[in-house]
Amino acid sequence: TKALDELIPNWKNEGAPVKTKVSKEKFLFLGKNSSLSWPTWLLPSVQKNHKNYIISLANLCRWLAEQAEKLGVEIFPGFPASEVLYNDDGSVKGVATLDMGLDKDGNKKDTYQEGMELHAKVTVFSEGCRGHLGKQLIKQFNLDEGKNPQQYGIGLKEIWEVSEEQHQKGLVMHTAGWPLDSKTYGGSFIYHAENRQIYLGYVIGLDYQNPYLSPFDEFQRFKTHPSIRKMFEGGKRISFGARALIEGGIQSLPKMYMPGALLIGCDAGTLN
């Protein structure tokens, strides 16, 4: 919580949704019907979660938005940035939001609302993986010159509600191995959060060689493993989703600044 401590020192008193401390960690290497527990002290530091918290990022972002609005920050949910605006000297001037209230042919409806121009001394782009404006900026300013090609993965996630007996609040668990073969990058995360909820996810690199591989089907197969299935039997899946992930690492990281703008987060490639 170092960054949160610096940003909002009294975040605990302000009701931040950061409550479930990591209490136990596991790393399993799975065979088809077996599992090998890997000693956590052998794991790299990025895989160690001592003193970390299990959170819902969506809940934290909503709370941070409330704190920002208290300081006078204006937030425009539902208004996507559609275009980068430039000054005469080529520097970034800001963005324009999308026109709203158009029919499928682009004609104006009664609810038409023209997009807004938002100008700033520095515009920060944080659109996530392969952001459509971020891609334009990387090309426009040649930010990836001399860098390795970027690599991508897909992450599938579910939230489950399980019984008290199956729930181990504070447990962080990762797995590698089955159902993927040795040539395919991927693995899982299983986080036991509050309210008897488990955040379950599976990530597969999109450079897999088998054209018949289905990331979704591999995720479902993973849940049938004896070491995994027992956590969810009798439980209920309450939400699910998927997203693209940046996997290229530091050797693929573009320059993150340009005249009048910054790239941050997965728009630049700084996963974790």
Regions found by a protein language model. Name each.
Residues 1-34:
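N-terminal FAD cofactor-binding segment of flavoenzymes
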Residues 58, 62-63, 67-231, 269-270:
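Predominantly flavin-linked oxidoreductase catalytic cores and closely associated redox partners
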Residues 19-21, 179-184, 244-245:
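A short catalytic or substrate-binding loop motif that flags glycine-/basic-rich loops and adjacent residues
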Residues 13, 104-109, 236, 244-245:
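Domain-scale detector for complete catalytic domains at protein termini or as standalone homologs
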Residues 36-57, 66, 94, 203-205:
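Helix-loop-beta segment of a Rossmann-like dinucleotide-binding subdomain
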Residues 242-271:
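FAD-binding beta-loop-beta segment adjacent to the flavin cofactor pocket
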Residues 230-241:
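Flexible, glycine/charged-enriched surface loops at secondary-structure junctions
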Residues 24, 185-188, 258-260:
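Short glycine-rich loop/turn motifs
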